[in-house]
Every structure is written in structure tokens, then in C-alpha cells.
């Protein structure tokens, strides 16, 4: 009788264990029965990329060139951030279509081409000059847009007087001048006798320009400590419009336009 009871107990226990195991298997959802959705991986948007990469700028700001007779000729000269230097040249016949006369004080009265700037640069220059007056600083515009032919005449005369190598240290070859873009303006002051000279950088007006130009989208294109990068002697009077965003980035990181585009990425 005892053996029968033990046998019955063992059988009952086994059935209980099997029943428990069966319930455990059913409680575990199979992959096919799972209703959980897998989150899709989203591609980063241009806005998100710009937030994570501080050097991101619109692709349209990069200079596009094509090799013509061994010279890199710019194909998008209307780009306000266009890089013009000894390596990258503007098309010979290029003339901006939006040239206007900025409403600022000039050092001369004649209505000649150097009075003009491209419209975005002209508006920014007006803002710059107005801010200067508010700080009791009085600037004078001296030389803006310059055609290819005019630059050719200026360089040829300087080369004849001083030699081509010496002339090229301060005067760009025709096609390689930022003045042809309509985005550059040379400025001076009465305290500097309206001259375009290094001494302007030591005047109150020149120091104000160095500290504030970028707030209005302008940079001092040829800095004294960057001659080895630009290949151009120090020109505290030469202001180049590139837009507030790029100008601020350049000043904050002490970069020339050449150095900036080595770091910048397109979005």
C-alpha cells in the first residue's frame, strides 16, 4: 500500500511539473507574436548637422572653379563669400549686375566706378558707418568696385614703376582683385589724411574698424600677422564683405578667408 501511495505521489508531481513548464513556454512571446515595433533610424537633417558641426555653411558659399589655360577661373563669382586670390581668378569680363552707390561719406565727389558696391555689401557698409558715427567714429569710403580693365591699368603702372614682384605685394593682378567682386571697400579717415596706409590701423578709426567690422559682415581681409597665408601685405583699410555669419566665425577663430574654407563643410 505504501509503495502505491509513493508511486501515485511521483506521478502527480511529474504531471504538475509538466503543466508548469507548459505554462512557462506559453507565457514567453515568440518573435512572430511580438507586437513591438523597431524604431527607424532617422537621417540627420541639415539643421541638425549644422548644430553638431560649427563649421557647416551653405554649399553655395564655396568657390567653384574651372581650369582655363592653367588658371583656376571662378565659375560662381556672384557668391558673396567667393574666394579671390592669386590662385583663384575672376572671369575677365565679370561685372556684378547689382552695383549700387552706398549711402555713406566718401573721400571724393565724382560719380566713378570706385563709388559702387554690390547691393548686399552696400547695405552692410551703411550699417557699419552708422554704427561708427554712434561711437563718434567718422569713416570715409575711398575705393570700392574696380573693373578688370581698371585693375589692369593700376597694376601695369605700378609694375612699371617698382617692378612686377614688388608691385604684386600690394596690388593684385587683374582678375585676382577682390575689388572686381564689388564686395570690397577701402576706407580711411581724416586723421589719416584719407590715405590708404598701414598707419590707418593705428588710428582710433582703424582700431574701431578692427573691433567692429565683423558685426556688419565685413572683415579686414589682409591682416598683418597673416601675410604668409594671403600673400598680400598688411592692409588695415581693405574691408571685404562676406556676411555676418562667416565674418564672425573668422574673427572668433582668427582666420583668413583661405583658412576658413579649409575648415568649413557644406550643408
Sequence positions of predicted segments:
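Sec-dependent N-terminal signal peptides of Gram-positive bacterial secreted proteins and lipoproteins
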Residues: 1-26
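Extracytoplasmic cell-surface/polysaccharide-interacting catalytic and binding patches
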Residues: 21-143, 148-267
Amino acid at each position: 500500500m505504501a509503495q502505491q501511495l509513493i508511486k501515485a505521489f511521483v506521478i502527480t508531481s511529474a504531471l504538475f511539473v509538466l503543466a508548469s513548464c507548459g505554462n512557462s513556454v506559453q507565457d514567453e512571446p515568440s518573435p512572430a507574436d511580438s507586437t513591438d515595433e523597431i524604431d527607424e533610424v532617422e537621417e540627420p537633417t541639415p539643421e541638425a548637422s549644422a548644430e553638431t558641426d560649427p563649421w557647416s555653411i551653405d554649399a553655395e558659399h564655396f568657390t567653384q572653379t574651372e581650369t582655363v589655360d592653367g588658371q583656376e577661373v571662378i565659375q560662381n563669382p556672384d557668391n558673396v563669400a567667393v574666394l579671390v586670390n592669386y590662385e583663384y581668378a575672376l572671369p575677365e569680363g565679370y561685372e556684378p549686375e547689382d552695383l549700387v552707390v552706398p549711402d555713406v561719406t566718401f573721400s571724393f565727389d565724382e560719380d566713378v566706378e570706385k563709388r559702387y558696391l554690390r547691393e548686399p555689401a552696400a547695405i552692410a557698409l551703411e550699417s557699419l558707418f552708422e554704427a561708427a558715427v554712434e561711437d563718434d567714429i567718422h569713416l570715409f569710403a575711398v575705393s570700392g568696385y574696380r573693373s578688370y580693365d581698371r585693375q589692369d591699368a593700376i597694376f601695369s603702372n605700378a609694375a612699371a614703376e617698382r617692378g612686377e614682384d614688388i608691385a604684386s605685394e600690394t596690388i593684385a593682378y587683374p582678375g585676382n582683385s577682390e575689388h572686381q567682386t564689388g564686395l570690397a571697400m577701402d576706407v580711411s579717415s581724416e586723421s589719416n589724411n584719407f590715405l590708404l596706409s598701414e598707419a590707418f590701423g593705428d588710428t582710433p578709426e582703424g582700431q574701431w574698424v578692427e573691433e567692429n567690422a565683423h558685426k556688419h559682415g565685413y572683415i579686414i581681409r589682409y591682416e598683418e600677422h597673416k601675410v604668409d597665408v594671403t600673400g598680400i601685405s598688411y592692409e588695415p583699410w581693405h574691408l571685404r564683405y562676406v556676411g555676418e555669419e562667416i565674418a564672425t566665425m573668422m574673427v572668433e577663430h582668427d582666420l583668413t578667408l583661405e583658412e576658413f574654407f579649409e575648415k568649413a563643410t557644406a550643408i
